[in-house]
C-alpha cells in the first residue's frame, strides 16, 4: 500500500538572533510551553536531555481525549541552523519534522518548519486527514507561532 505523504510548511520571522531561537528549541522541555494545553503534552524523558543525533525523547499527550505516547528521535543536529526529529513511536506512520533557522540581516531569525507526515490506514486515514488531522496540525502550529515570540522576549 502506498503512503499518502502530506506536507505542512510554516515560516515565521522572529525578533531574536539565531542562537537564541536555536537555544529555545534545543530544550525539549520548552515544547510544553508552545503546545496547546488541550493536548496535555508532557515530556516523559528525565531532564536534562542532552540533545544530538540519536537522542530519544519520550512524550505523553492526549489527541481528542485519547492518551498516547510519542517517541521522537533526533535524526540531524546542526546547531544553530537546523535539526530534524522523526517519530519512532506514536500516532503517525511517518512524521519527519525539519526545523531550519536562517539569520536575517536585521538581526532577526527566519524559522522554517517542514513536516512530512502520513497517517497510514489507507482510505480511512485520508478521510481522517481531511476531516480532522490537517486542521488540528494547523491549529497546533498556529498556537506555537503565537507562543514562541513571548518565550524569546
Region annotations inferred by a language model:
Residues 1-52:
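Hydrophobic ligand-binding cavity/cleft-lining segments
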Residues 4, 150-153:
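Generic C-terminal helix-cap and adjacent flexible tail
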Residues 7-9, 67-71, 94-98:
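Short, surface-exposed coil-to-beta transition loops
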Residues 11-15, 42, 60, 73, ...:
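Generic structural detector for well-ordered beta-strands
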Residues 42-89, 110, 143-151:
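Glycine-rich portal/gate segments that line the openings of hydrophobic small-molecule binding cavities
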Residues 84-139:
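Beta-strand/loop substructures that line and gate deep hydrophobic ligand-binding cavities in soluble
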